[in-house]
Design a protein with these regions (language model features):
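Short active-site oxyanion
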Residues: 37-41, 76, 112-114
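Alpha-helix capping/helix-boundary segments
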Residues: 12, 47, 87, 104, ...
């Protein structure tokens, strides 16, 4: 089985880093599986600064150090994709209603990733690129790879 590589939408990253309920547990399960090498996770370089701004409530100095600490931990197993001028121009020329979605789709296609994980039900369909939430991603892995990710109760 080849390791799957997926791009995470910002909402999934916020669910995990911000422990946003009720979505945190599914995002946490995704991060744990990635941390032990089950699949590769990707985010864009632009998402890094977006996350600092959002999670520090607009850049509040007292919150920034903790946000940076969480992002450094995430970077232990999360790949970051650069955003090129060509990517930015493609996003600017896109007719998608959400520019971030257009950029993420462009990056996922450029990197030849296997899927995009998002909670955005309005994320447009992309030919040849599954777009799903965390729960559907694990169901997809069960169907396509025969792998079941369940938490062990100790």
């Amino acid at each position: 089985m080849a390791r799957k590589s997926v791009l995470l939408d910002t909402n999934v990253l916020i669910d995990f880093l911000g422990t946003r309920q009720p979505f945190f547990e599914q995002a946490r399960k995704l991060m744990i599986a990635a941390r032990v090498g089950e699949f590769e996770l990707w985010m864009s370089a632009s998402q890094v600064t977006d996350l600092v701004y959002i999670l520090s409530e607009g850049g509040k100095k007292r919150l920034v150090p903790e946000v940076l600490r969480r992002l450094r931990t995430l970077r232990l197993f999360m790949n970051v994709c650069p955003v090129t001028a060509v990517d930015a121009d493609a996003m600017l020329a896109s007719d998608w209603s959400d520019p971030e979605d257009a950029l993420l789709a462009r990056l996922a296609l450029r990197l030849k990733l296997d899927a995009i994980i998002t909670r955005d039900e309005d994320f447009p369909h992309i030919d040849g690129m599954p777009v799903m939430d965390c729960e559907d991603f694990f169901a997809w892995l069960r169907e396509t790879e025969g792998v079941v990710y369940e938490e062990a109760v100790l």
